[in-house]
């Protein structure tokens, strides 16, 4: 299981831990990832993803899980999220047409 957000592609960063005497040692800054179950309105089913807490705020800001996925770029999404996005688009096209 990688330490990468499935919605925003937020990943670990590398930097320095700096002591009081200014000695620098390498360290990793890990994203705050949580396992979340989103409810897709279009699919009417729960979707379980591993996302960052920043992504949770972004999903709320954009108006829900379906709206977030439809506005998101495929380059930022995981393969699982891209497949869910395609299913949502297909379902909405079937309902509209």
From Swiss-Prot:
Keywords annotated in UniProt: Ribonucleoprotein, Ribosomal protein
Signal peptide: none
Coiled-coil regions listed in the entry: none
Molecular function terms, GO-annotated: structural constituent of ribosome
Protein name, entry field: Large ribosomal subunit protein bL28
InterPro entries: Ribosomal_bL28 (IPR026569), Ribosomal_bL28/bL31-like_sf (IPR034704), Ribosomal_bL28_bact-type (IPR001383), Ribosomal_bL28_sf (IPR037147)
HAMAP family on file: Ribosomal_bL28
GO cellular component, one term: cytosolic large ribosomal subunit
Name of the gene: rpmB
A Pfam family this chain is assigned to: Ribosomal_L28
One GO biological process term: translation
Superkingdom per UniProt: Bacteria
The family this protein is said to belong to: Belongs to the bacterial ribosomal protein bL28 family.
